[in-house]
Amino acid sequence: DMSVQDIIKAMDDNLNAKSRILTSKMVVHGRRSTRTIESQNWIVGTDYAFTEYLSPPREAGTKMLKLGAKLWTYSPQTDRVIQISGHMLRQSVMGSDMSCNDMMEDRPLMELYDAKLEGSVEIDGRDHWIMLLEAKEKGLSYPKRRAWIDKEYLLPMKEELYAKSGKLLKTASMDGIKKVQGRWFPTRFIFKDELKRNSKGTEWIMGEIQFDADIPESRFEKGRLRK
């Protein structure tokens, strides 16, 4: 049988990569209407990420650059670059249920959390482990999380994300699992901000995705924001 460490490592291997390039759609279900925002993302490890919004027209050309714990956003409307840091990285992106960190961070759980197995459960005819993860370091967006991990896919099909106090901040789930470059990976993530009473959730739908792609360092230069 797999040890807790084996499970976490397998999950990290599926979800993380040295780098990735992806196009994605964010579908934000508001109270009255639904918005769809398309973007292209370049991510290297945990420290470098660049996002460019492609549509709708109002958001097109907006860009985000993340270097470590710092984030810069560029808005073509104002032609200004603004720096965001610290707790602001936990704020909502474009009114969605996702934060900058949810979208742009690629950090292995193994490094960040101590895990313990709470049991097993069958969901929709598939076996899952239930695992509790507690932060090893301060300052994480989600100091505690509980994950339901599919025993075949080795992916957290459902997660509850908690504050240090134990308050439920968000729920996340994934579906549309398929093999991408030899790994199981979801086609869709669903995030729900549990602190927003009226939230109907945000879908993050993967388009084309390339893992371990070569991304030139110049992609992460601040000058790119205005180009």
Label every PLM stretch briefly.
Residues 27, 44-46, 54-56, 69-70, ...:
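Solvent-exposed coil/turn segments that connect beta secondary-structure elements
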Residues 80-84, 101-104, 124-222:
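Gly/Pro-enriched, hydrophobic low-complexity segments
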Residues 75-105:
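Acidic/charged, solvent-exposed loop-and-adjacent secondary-structure segments enriched in E/D, K/R, S/T
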Residues 4, 34, 104-116, 166-171:
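A short, amphipathic edge element
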